[in-house]
C-alpha cells in the first residue's frame, strides 16, 4: 500500500524490505534528485498513539545504518532524505500520512 502510494506520487521504487546488519528499510525510492529511505508504520487504531511515534531514536539509528550501507554499496550520487509513512486504520479504512524529510540522520 505504501509503495503504491509513493508510485502514485511519482516516486521510483528501487527496493522493498532491503536488509543490512540484520536490520531493514521498508522502501528505498527516488524522488527527483533525492534517494529516499522510507519507514512504514501501520496501526489498526490510535490506542497506542500515531504510528509515526514508533520511529524513535533507536529506530532512526537502525534506518540510518542501513541507509548508509545502501548508499555506499550502490555508489549513490543523490541527496539523501528520510521519510515516514504512517498508515492508521479507522473502521477498516486506511488513512495515509506521508511525512517528508521526517528526520535527519539520528537526531
Label each region the model flagged.
Residues 20-23, 93:
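Short acidic/glycine-enriched loop/turn segments that link adjacent beta-strands
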Residues 6, 63, 82:
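Residue-level signal for inorganic ion chemistry
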Residues 1-16:
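Acidic-basic catalytic patches of nuclease active cores, encompassing PD-(D/E)XK
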Residues 44-46, 88:
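Feature marks short, surface-exposed loop/turn motifs that line or immediately flank catalytic pockets
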Residues 73-107:
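Domain-level recognition of nuclease-like catalytic cores that cleave nucleotide substrates
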Residues 25-44, 55-57, 63:
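Conserved catalytic cores of phosphodiester-cleaving nucleases, focusing on short active-site segments
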Residues 47-78:
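Mid-chain, well-packed structural core segment of small domains
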